[in-house]
Swiss-Prot record:
Gene3D superfamilies: Ribosomal protein L13. Belongs to the universal ribosomal protein uL13 family. SUPFAM superfamilies: Ribosomal protein L13 (SSF52161). NCBIfam families: rplM_bact. Transmembrane segments: none annotated. Residues 139-150 have a biased composition (Polar residues). This is Large ribosomal subunit protein uL13. Signal peptide: none annotated. Part of the 50S ribosomal subunit. It comes from Parasynechococcus marenigrum (strain WH8102). One of its GO terms (biological process) is negative regulation of translation.
Length: 150
């Protein structure tokens, strides 16, 4: 009987990818980035190990959603105190903290456990086209053409 070989985590070569979110649809971009963070694009993918790569997302303020979502999609957060529920629309959050929209969409597509939190730490989202990870030489990640908003 053959024994399944597992990749050694310390021997994995982690790549850095750069994604430009300008005029991309939020959900379509998030699914592809989440797959790269999980490592689903690697031949050494193992569900219970973090084999994913690093992803840098720039131009988070230029992400798009379809239909009436800019005015109707709500983001909720709670302070933990009685009556501490805060609700904000997509437009308002995009004006205030556009990085949080992309982060929340991608985080919801990762496993909801300690492994998912570890994968989420490899995501870097920035407003504008500048980022501090030039030393890692991130390669542009080719997204599916349907991710671009019409």
């Amino acid at each position: 009987m053959n024994k399944t070989s597992l990749p050694q985590i310390d021997s994995l070569e982690r790549q850095w990818y750069l994604v430009d979110a300008e005029n991309k649809t939020l959900g379509r971009l998030a699914t592809e980035v989440a797959a790269v963070l999980r490592g689903k694009n690697n031949p050494s993918f193992t569900p219970h190990l973090d084999t994913g790569d690093f992803v840098v997302v720039v131009n988070a303020e230029k992400i798009r959603v379809s239909g009436s979502k800019p005015t109707q999609k709500l983001y909720r957060r709670h302070s933990g105190r009685p009556g501490g529920m805060k609700t904000e629309t997509f437009e308002a959050l995009q004006d205030r903290i556009p990085e949080r929209i992309v982060e929340k969409a991608i985080k919801g597509m990762l496993p909801h456990n300690a492994l998912g939190r570890q994968m989420f730490r490899k995501l870097k989202v920035y407003k504008g086209s500048e980022h501090p990870h030039a030393a890692q030489k991130p390669q542009p990640l080719q997204l599916n053409p349907s991710a671009s908003a019409q």
